[in-house]
Amino acid sequence: MSQNAGVRMNPFGNRKPVIDPRLFIGRRSLIDAVCERLTAAPPQCCALVGDARSGKTSLLYYLRSSTAARPICADATRFVFPYVNAGPYADLGASQSHGALYFWRDLARATAQALALPDDLPTLPDQGIAEAAIVDTVYALKCTVEDIIRRTGDHTFIFLIDNVEGIARLPRHTASFLRSLTQDPDIGDRVAYVVTSSTPLSRLYPVSELREPSSFWGLFASELFIGGLDDADIAALLERAPELNDADRAWIRRLGGANLTLILIAAAHVYEWRLHPTGSPDDAERAAIEEARPLCRSWWRELTETHTASVDARQSLIDQNRAPTPDEAAIFEALHARGLAQRDRHGWRIASTIFAQALSDQPDRPSTSLPPPPAAAPATPPAFTHLEGEVYAFLRENAGRVCTRDEVKRAIWPVSPPSDSALQKIIERIRDKIEPDPKHPRKLIAVRGQGYMLRRDTD
């Protein structure tokens, strides 16, 4: 918490990844599970799976912050944690080969920087270079990483790859080269990966390919799910604001359940109301629900697409007037893992008022046998990828004003931001999904020499 010109900052206002390890809250059991894998001989690869804004990136930053004075996994001097966000490379579209090039350049640079070495990297070829030359340069960058590892025999390299879905969209040699580092007889027992994904790895590639012995994805024997917070974590989080009383904390718990993002949203609005109690508490509650509604709807949509269940699953969870079917129960278990539902002797119930309200307002999905809804009906939210959704959400929060490229990058990628061209690709993909005519955008426009602006009248 800080002060600016005498105005106390909202300690729950920043819901971007936590960079300062002193502000990282809890997840002790999850960290212990990761460390158990990393301290094995040889270290084991680990996949962290969780919804958007569940704290995956913050956990990677926390691992990377390990020091001799504050070790996280046993001997801090043993581990080196190079970090790369693979998300931007997934959004390069037809430039996938160049995506592999940028990924390996960033991985080599992160490896050198983790050891405070100069990043003397091979020169990248021009955009119009032949495919074979790109592969040669990627291989040279991979060899650079190998050489760094080979020269530092007293370190174990744990590569932190955020949004590993990006790797699945790159040429297969990218994943093959990553696996080869773990198979090298000289360095393989000092290399492992901790990756994050918003979806189980089994959904990134065909099952047959995942089971291939030579597959990079076969390195991840198990996945750890980043779910709801426990009571101690929630209590520690709310201690950031001593202005809150016990009734406020109970109110926040009722609104957010045990879900990190919804607790932060609820806490931010309750905190503001406590300091400036204008209007009624209902106004603060409605504001929190309104802010979280798009995110809750996207979570529900992803769950119902992943699990086979009828639209009655939502009504069953809200009304609690019948026992759920086995398919519906699978959805409720998934909600429970996310801190959004609880089970007691009476059955399942929603643990978060925010989520319950978002579901009660969610229109049923139409049957595939019905004609499409008329044009006047409310539009279905665009099926954004994780990064597209993050960029769009930021632009929507700042609708009506120009956001510079650097401003967008700092908000979404506090560490390892993408190039301007990679950001432009993401913008173009967003336009494809929200513009009637993407070639002549009217909603998401570029302001020459400045940045991007989402018009206020955008749905």
What do the predicted segments below correspond to?
Residues 1-73, 147, 151, 405:
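Walker A/P-loop-proximal flanking segment of P-loop NTPase domains
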Residues 81-120:
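Conserved NTP-binding/hydrolysis module of P-loop NTPases
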Residues 106, 110-161, 165-172, 183-190:
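Mid-core helix/loop region of P-loop NTP-binding domains shared across ATPases and GTPases
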Residues 220-248, 266:
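Conserved small helical "lid"/interfacial subdomain of P-loop NTPases
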Residues 374-384, 416-417, 421-459:
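DNA-binding patch around the recognition helix
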